[in-house]
Regions:
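His/Asp/Glu-rich metal-coordinating catalytic cores
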Residues: 2-14, 20-25, 29, 35-169, ...
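Conserved helicase motor "Helicase C" RecA-like lobe of SF1/SF2 P-loop NTPases
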Residues: 181-196
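Short acidic-hydrophobic, aromatic-tinged amphipathic segments that line or gate anion-handling sites
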Residues: 67-71, 75-77, 212-223
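Long, charge-dense
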Residues: 193-213
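Short, surface-exposed amphipathic charged segments that create phosphate/polyanion-binding patches used
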Residues: 81-87, 205-212, 232
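C-terminal regulatory/interaction regions
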Residues: 187, 217-248
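A short acidic (Asp/Glu
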Residues: 179-184, 204-205, 244
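Structural motif
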Residues: 24, 52, 172-173, 195-197, ...
Length: 248
């Protein structure tokens, strides 16, 4: 790939700095781009991550791991290699990793997006020699509508359901996507409820300084609660379960 990075069975490795970026298996030092489970894995001895996402990392990995939380743009020297983190726009605390040694600069994007998002800082372009990009949706067949269009449709659907006394259910991953949904909907339409995992993640987001509408735990409601007009946000894993059937 470059002299700075190589792909190993544990993931991207910087030999000169002796650290990995989002490694797949436990290592001594991991630079982690964001707190989603496929990137922030447990078992590493030391973690370097963006301070903006500290509370989300702690929710994901607990209080025990040794973390070095850094501000965006703050430099760390790891065995002669300069490392800094820069906004990736994917979720709160998501970062690109800038790696520099002897004039060569490599940037590992991690997951990122270019659309504006009130739950995270916007993607920051960084000048570099090598850009290692995430490309899950890199094919040209993927064309995304604007956030304004998507949330306009969601709010209109929720309003229509509320008008006939029906609840509305949205699925979103507990950490990241659920909070993005909550930040975009109109909370004046009706009450908002969430799965316990989502409510806990929202608390971590608020601790990181993200403004989200009030959300009540579904578990806190009585067994005969009237869900008319409510918005319920649930993880995809709840689909088809007894938990979700209470809203039928």
């Amino acid at each position: 790939m470059t002299q700075l990075l190589k792909l190993t069975r544990r993931g991207l490795y910087c030999d000169a700095g002796d650290f990995y970026v989002d490694p797949w298996t436990p290592v001594e030092r991991a630079v982690v781009t964001h707190a989603h489970a496929d990137h922030a894995r447990p078992g590493h001895q030391k973690y370097l991550a963006a301070k903006e996402g500290e509370h989300i990392f702690r929710l994901r990995l607990g209080a025990e791991p040794e973390f070095d939380f850094v501000e965006f743009g703050e430099m760390r020297n790891l065995n002669g290699v300069n490392v800094s983190l820069h906004p990736a726009g994917h979720m709160t605390g998501s970062a690109q990793v800038r790696i520099e040694r002897r004039g060569e600069v490599c940037v590992v994007s991690g997951d990122y997006k270019l659309q504006s998002d009130p739950t995270t800082r916007s993607f920051e372009p960084i000048r570099c020699n090598i850009f290692v990009t995430e490309s899950t949706f890199g094919l040209p067949i993927f064309r995304w509508e604007t956030s304004e269009s998507v949330f306009g449709e969601i709010n209109a659907w929720w309003s229509a359901n509320a008008a006939i006394g029906k609840p509305t259910v949205l699925y979103g991953y507990s950490v990241g996507k659920a909070q993005r949904l909550l930040a975009g909907v109109d909370p004046h339409i009706g009450p908002i409820f969430g799965h316990g995992a989502i409510v806990n993640a929202c608390a971590a987001y608020r601790a990181c300084g993200v403004d989200l509408p009030d959300i009540q735990s579904v578990q806190s409601a009585t067994s005969n609660h009237d869900w008319s007009g409510a918005l319920i946000v649930a993880p995809p894993s709840a689909h088809g379960t007894a938990w979700i059937r209470r809203f039928d």
